[in-house]
């Protein structure tokens, strides 16, 4: 929730009130009560991460818990049921509501990790459901329905931006603000602006940085909260450190860190030890005494009232005695193990599930897995490598400044085995100019040789392709028909003509032998007949040839046998069909796939490869074909159309599935370079029978065949192809 300034003062308590809480009146000691609060916050953090809610929701739930126990005792309300209630309510308030069932299951998994999942039908689940719903009402009444919470994180971000603090300092301050909620009761004593100033002040001492005064002569905290003084900051910082000192299990954790420091690095990984010698030892001033940071009057101030970037103090010059430093470092490391210089990861923490519940300290390993948008982590993964002596941080944490990176590497040289050398294979190999030219020449020679071989192979296959296509079959064997991948069946410059040769499907349809096949005399008569006598039948034939697949029938193959001269013309025809089909595709005619449950044949694949090889040459010579190519193309198209019509009329009962009618648009039908404009009717006649699949009304189409047949006849006569 967006927090409005001016929270109710009824939720800020004095020290006397904190010493007289309901838990204290019930006989709970102050340290024990603080331990209960820390463990409750730890449980809320763990549950929030498993429920995948934002860190803002988790922080709000922790504040609910702190305020609730200012009016109720830990002896009457167990923290293990109040924590799920607070998170359940906070998720609703922050608009990240989670199901009650999920909250109860996650709470059970966190509290009892070794037990099986909770069954929703068992009595324990039903009892927890009733308790949580009842406690939610009690919590709302206790809070007085003041559910909007102000957090210090907002003021921390604003102040660090105001003073132009480094990313490292801003992240450390943000981390301290979260720790103040988990480990202290500052949210019950001070306003969020005061807590933000304390966190920034503590982060400055922790990171050994200084924020100078502004051009107006004011300290940075005066811009955040005018009531804050340096004495108050020092006092609260000292109190924060005392709370960290009382945090249990700190020595156990520091011993684990020191044990990890003695382990050698394996497989180029960075050791998971925090740099105690660089960050903790040199920041021991936090424990010895809390003193104010003197202003630097000699620092060049900018012209505006904003603060310049913080400057580092004399880092590395502080000397610490070993007798006292070990205990003090234990205090600091236990409370705030993941500082800006730390490269520790969550694997170094104790992984025992029981210890996570019994230790009252907030488990830091949970903060390492938070999302970067809600919570800024300060832990480094174990797989991050060191290159060029610089510590690279993960993506969640911003990069250090170059000065701090060098300082970290120098100070941590005792913990690491020196910078890891770069991989030998990473550097590019240097090559002289002569060697480069020789290598380039060899590569070019190989490419030319390969292209020459492929061109020769394609030409050879192109020569043998028609020979395989005209191979005859017996009358009783299945007929090989080539079905194009598109439904455009008109003999025009279309994709179907391109696919007929390159991407045709070979469909084997076993049919009974015909009683009497069409003779060559009949085929000749179909071409030589006068247009006046053939007007209606040619209309029907054109509909068949346009609305049926261009099958290559057995008669057409026999015609190719008897006219070997067509073999030479067919090669020109296929080249021209390729160039025409590609040009028509560029005009925007979308081809429709003819669905047939067959695959490509070997002849189709070889012809497709050869056609692709010859595509560029055919496109270059597209406009320079001779009359022989035109006439042969026209003759081949006419004979193919007539033979297909004859075949379909004699065996129309085989094809039980009609092809879809063409779309009602205007097409350019071309026989070679002879083109006639054909306008299809907007409502094509739908076939209703096996014979009607290829027959349409003559009134739906209009075409002047007389000129076309006269031109065909004259061309055939000119070439000596007159039959």
Swiss-Prot record:
Bias (Polar residues) ranges: 297-307, 314-325
Ranges of compositional bias, category Basic and acidic residues: 395-409, 489-503, 517-543, 552-565
Region feature (Interaction with POLR2A): 250-298
Entry annotated with the keyword Ubl conjugation: yes
Cross-link named Glycyl lysine isopeptide (Lys-Gly) (interchain with G-Cter in SUMO2), sites: 404
CDD domains: CYCLIN_CCNT2_rpt1, CYCLIN_CCNT2_rpt2
Basic residues: bias regions: 566-576
Low complexity bias (residue ranges): 631-645
One of the GO BP terms on file: regulation of muscle cell differentiation
Domain of life: Eukaryota
Residue ranges annotated for the Cyclin N-terminal domain, each copy included: 12-147
Keywords: Cell cycle, Cell division, Cyclin, Cytoplasm, Host-virus interaction, Isopeptide bond, Nucleus, Phosphoprotein, Transcription, Transcription regulation, Ubl conjugation
Region (Interaction with MDFIC and MDFI): 1-298
Record bears the keyword Nucleus: yes
Entry's localization field: Cytoplasm, Perinuclear region; Nucleus
Similarity field: Belongs to the cyclin family. Cyclin C subfamily.
Assembly mode: Interacts with CDK9 to form P-TEFb. Interacts with POLR2A (via the C-terminal domain (CTD)); mediates transcriptional activity. Interacts with HEXIM1; mediates formation of a tripartite complex with KPNA2. Interacts with HEXIM2. Interacts with PKN1; enhances MYOD1-dependent transcription. P-TEFB complex interacts with RB1; promotes phosphorylation of RB1. P-TEFB complex interacts with MYOD1; promotes the transcriptional activity of MYOD1 through its CDK9-mediated phosphorylation. Interacts with MDFI and MDFIC.
Function description: Regulatory subunit of the cyclin-dependent kinase pair (CDK9/cyclin T) complex, also called positive transcription elongation factor B (P-TEFB), which is proposed to facilitate the transition from abortive to production elongation by phosphorylating the CTD (carboxy-terminal domain) of the large subunit of RNA polymerase II (RNAP II). The activity of this complex is regulated by binding with 7SK snRNA.
PANTHER family from the UniProt entry: CYCLIN (PTHR10026)
Protein name: Cyclin-T2
Species of origin: Mus musculus (Mouse)
